[in-house]
Each structure stands twice: as C-alpha cells, then as structure tokens.
C-alpha cells in the first residue's frame, strides 16, 4: 500500500483546528502508515492543540491584516514574506502528495507555495460565505470541500464537493451520556441546563450578557455550564464569588464537550461554522450570537442559513446584553419550541464529513 504524505494547514481558533485534527485522525485510521505534517501560525493555539493530538507542526510567523490601521500592515507584509519562504522550505523538505487548507492565517501561504511547486491543493471552506484568501486560492485548488449549498457564487462549480464540516470525534455518542454528563459538572437532572460557549478564545458580549444576568438564570431555576474562553475567565471567576452554591459550572475551556452538549437543553453560542456543524449533528436547540469581528460578517450569514429554516434563533451582538438571557430563558422553558428547533437543526446535519474529505484527498493523490 502506498505511503501517503500530507500537509494540513490552518488554525487560529478551535473552529479550524478541531476539524483539521478530525481529518488527520480519519486519514490515519484508514492509512496508518501515512505521514501527516501540520503547518500553523507560530503564536496561535494550534501550536499546543496539534502536538497534544499526536501530530508534528511547523509554525509560520504569519498574522492577519489590520483593516482598521493600514500602516500596521508593513509588519504584516514582512511576516508574510518570511512565512512564504518557510512554507516553501517546509514543502521542499517534506515532499507532500497534497496540501489541505482548513482556513486560518497559515493556510494561505502554505497552499500558495504548494501549488507553485506543483503540489495539488484541497481547500476545506467551512462557512456559507467564502473569505478572500480561499477565493484567491480556489484558482489553484484541485477540489474545494464545502458545507453549504450555493457556493458556486464564490468558487468554480466543477471544483466544489459538498462534504459538510468535520466535527470532534468524541461527539459521536454525546447524546447517550446525559446523566453521566450532569454528574461530571455537578449539576441536577431536575433542572433545565443552558450551555454557554463563545469559542475557544471567548466572546466579550456573550460573557458580559451572562455575567450581568446571572440572577435571572437562578430565579428561573435554570443551571448554567459556562465556557468563558481564555481571555475572560479571570473576570468571570471573580464575579462568581458572589454566587457560591449556585448551580453554575464555569471554566475557560471545556475539555469534555461531549458531556457539555449532552447535559444541555439549550445552547448559547457564536455562529462559527464548526460550532454550527456540531449543533446540527447533535440536534441541539441554539441561540446564536454572531461575532461582528469576522471577515465579511460571515457568522451572520452562517446563522441566517439556520434561522431561515427555523433551525436556530439569532440575537445580534449589539442587542445581546439586553435580549440574550431573556430570550434563552423563554425558549428553555418552552418544550414545544425546543423540540421544533432540535428537529429542524438536525435535518441540516452533514454526517461522515471527515470521511468524505479523505475520499476527495485520496482521489486527488491517486490521479497524480
């Protein structure tokens, strides 16, 4: 059997990293002798998460463009030039059969240099609205794996394959663990539970909304699992000292998302593509608060794709501190509404996405 060599590039947030690791794990399960190398951004969370998953990673000194302060981009361009050189060196030394881009800062220079050296490239576009980098890379890609219909307005139709977004493999059996999950968080099976997640780094508006309205949760006999993200945990934990003994579990990062989803009757979340894919797979009712701080406002577009099918409720970031908690509490006590949202979001699930993407990778390599 042929020994495949693959580069997977991208990261920056859990929404890019966990699908990338899922693709790698699926490939290794099918082809145990495969050599897989990750290429990420040197100061981002992939530099920790990827080695923890058992894979080697090279860090590029790449960073995003500052659209608000154009003069700051001189340093960005210098870092980009260094990243292109390191990406070229990495590709020459590793000699991959294919380069797979999953989004994030490192994906652009890696796939660009791979294509310039005759290495086939595959893009995994997670969002319903393609970013500038992937639109540029599309010309050089052999295939583009997407999660939403209608992506031919961004990419050549003959290159598009609808695969869905891979999810963390520990979520596969999440719904069968509710009693075990509630015990893990020290919560009661007699109360409704709301899971609050703002992404691996955190979401300021969501955290402020929860912090400001904690009394409303407890007055409504609702318990909370709250992931603050790395940047907001210190402030939240200080605030919670006034609520000792109340049914709230709080941490900067949830290591057992299978338990968190299983315990939750309702989820409050940003509208990143990876989170939405997980929610669809598990049929979890959700109130989405799209981040306004993303390229092309793509999270709002992701959320609206669900809202238009009555598969989620959306609160604009600017309205969250006023409306988020009252809306969530109204929904969590309405079993009929919970059932409708759950049923509708589950119909949008794309299952076995990592396997489909691996199929496309193998087809491209075997054509060489």
From Swiss-Prot:
Q: Name one Pfam family in it.
A: Glyco_transf_28
Q: Does the keyword Zinc apply?
A: no
Which residues are involved in binding UDP-N-acetyl-alpha-D-glucosamine?
Answer: 13-15, 127, 168, 200, 254, 299
Matching Gene3D superfamilies, A to Z?
Glycogen Phosphorylase B
Its principal location? membrane
Which keywords has UniProt assigned to this entry? Cell cycle, Cell division, Cell inner membrane, Cell membrane, Cell shape, Cell wall biogenesis/degradation, Glycosyltransferase, Membrane, Peptidoglycan synthesis, Transferase
Q: Which reaction does it catalyse?
A: di-trans,octa-cis-undecaprenyl diphospho-N-acetyl-alpha-D-muramoyl-L-alanyl-D-glutamyl-meso-2,6-diaminopimeloyl-D-alanyl-D-alanine + UDP-N-acetyl-alpha-D-glucosamine = di-trans,octa-cis-undecaprenyl diphospho-[N-acetyl-alpha-D-glucosaminyl-(1->4)]-N-acetyl-alpha-D-muramoyl-L-alanyl-D-glutamyl-meso-2,6-diaminopimeloyl-D-alanyl-D-alanine + UDP + H(+)
Q: What is the lineage of its organism?
A: Bacteria, Pseudomonadati, Bacteroidota, Bacteroidia, Bacteroidales
Named from the GO MF annotations, one term is: UDP-N-acetyl-D-glucosamine:N-acetylmuramoyl-L-alanyl-D-glutamyl-meso-2,6-diaminopimelyl-D-alanyl-D-alanine-diphosphoundecaprenol 4-beta-N-acetylglucosaminlytransferase activity
The UniProt family comment states: Belongs to the glycosyltransferase 28 family. MurG subfamily.
By what name is this protein known? UDP-N-acetylglucosamine--N-acetylmuramyl-(pentapeptide) pyrophosphoryl-undecaprenol N-acetylglucosamine transferase
Which Enzyme Commission number(s) are on file for it? 2.4.1.227
Q: Part of which pathway?
A: Cell wall biogenesis; peptidoglycan biosynthesis
Q: Briefly state the protein's biological role.
A: Cell wall formation. Catalyzes the transfer of a GlcNAc subunit on undecaprenyl-pyrophosphoryl-MurNAc-pentapeptide (lipid intermediate I) to form undecaprenyl-pyrophosphoryl-MurNAc-(pentapeptide)GlcNAc (lipid intermediate II).
EC primary class? transferase
Tell me how this protein sits in the membrane: Peripheral membrane protein
The GO annotation for biological process reads: carbohydrate metabolic process; cell division; cell wall organization; lipid glycosylation; peptidoglycan biosynthetic process; regulation of cell shape
Q: Where in the cell is it found?
A: Cell inner membrane
Task: Name any GO cellular component annotation.
Answer: plasma membrane
């Amino acid at each position: 059997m042929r020994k495949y060599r693959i580069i997977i590039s991208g990261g920056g947030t859990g929404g890019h990293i966990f699908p990338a690791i899922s693709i790698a794990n699926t490939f290794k399960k099918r082809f145990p002798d495969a050599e897989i190398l990750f290429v990420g951004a040197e100061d981002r969370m992939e530099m920790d998460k990827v080695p923890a998953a058992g894979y080697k990673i090279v860090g590029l000194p790449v960073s995003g463009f500052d659209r608000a302060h154009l003069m700051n981009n001189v340093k960005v361009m210098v870092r980009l030039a260094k990243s292109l050189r390191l990406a070229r060196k990495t590709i020459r030394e590793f000699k991959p059969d294919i380069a797979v881009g999953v989004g994030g800062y490192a994906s652009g220079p890696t796939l660009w240099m791979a294509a310039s050296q005759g290495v086939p490239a595959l893009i995994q576009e997670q969002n319903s609205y393609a970013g500038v980098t992937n639109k540029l890379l599309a010309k050089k890609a052999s295939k583009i794996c997407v999660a939403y219909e209608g992506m031919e307005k961004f990419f050549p139709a003959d290159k598009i394959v609808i695969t869905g977004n891979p999810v963390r493999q520990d979520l596969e059996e999440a719904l069968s663990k509710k009693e075990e999950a509630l015990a893990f968080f020290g919560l009661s099976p007699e109360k409704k539970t709301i899971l609050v997640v703002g992404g691996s780094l955190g979401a300021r508006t969501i955290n402020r909304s929860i912090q400001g309205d904690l009394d409303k949760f407890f007055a409504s006999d609702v318990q909370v699992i709250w992931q603050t993200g790395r940047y907001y945990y210190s402030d939240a934990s200080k605030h919670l000292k006034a609520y000792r003994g109340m049914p709230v579990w709080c941490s900067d990062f949830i290591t057992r998302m299978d338990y968190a989803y299983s315990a939750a009757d309702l989820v409050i979340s940003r509208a990143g593509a990876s989170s939405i894919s997980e929610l669809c797979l598990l049929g979890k009712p959700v109130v989405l608060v799209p981040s306004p701080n993303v390229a092309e406002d793509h999270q709002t577009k992701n959320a609206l794709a669900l809202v238009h099918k009555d598969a989620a409720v959306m609160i604009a970031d600017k309205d969250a501190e006023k409306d988020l908690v009252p809306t969530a509490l109204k929904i969590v006590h309405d079993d009929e509404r919970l059932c409708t949202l759950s049923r509708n979001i589950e119909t949008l699930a794309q299952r076995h996405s990592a396997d489909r993407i691996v199929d496309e990778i193998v087809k491209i390599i075997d054509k060489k």
